[in-house]
From Swiss-Prot:
It comes from Pseudomonas putida (strain GB-1). GO terms for biological process: protein repair; response to oxidative stress. Binds 1 zinc ion per subunit. The zinc ion is important for the structural integrity of the protein. Gene3D superfamilies: Peptide methionine sulfoxide reductase. This is Peptide methionine sulfoxide reductase MsrB. Its EC number is 1.8.4.12. It is an enzyme of class 1 (oxidoreductase). Its cofactor is Zn(2+). The gene is msrB. NCBIfam families: peptide-methionine (R)-S-oxide reductase MsrB.
Amino acid sequence: MKKIEKTLDEWRSMLDPEQYQVCRLKGTERPFSGKYNSERRDGIYHCICCNLPLFDAQTKFDSGCGWPSFYAPIEDSAMIEIRDTSHGMIRTEVTCARCDAHLGHVFPDGPAPTGLRYCINSVCIDLRPRD
């Protein structure tokens, strides 16, 4: 996959302040505040920064954690997993494989068939109808 590389100033000019804070500076939106937390429409969730398809809405589930949760990415190659030891915790950060946008974290407490919970910030994704 061809990487998209931009300066922080370029990202800042194309994203709104919250998207920039979360996607480029590894922030986190407040729990239960994101527009996709309770979303039930069908479609494909894309990276807000580069439009890469990330998650199929059919893999979304209600985890009760306050952020949209999915049990699998649309393709394993769409994500990069990075060990995250910030805030006194050991977690696995997930970023977009194309543009390195911070998306959220993945945890080993999800439903079958994967047992994974991709906990994703709503500001990092865009739900679009299937083609």
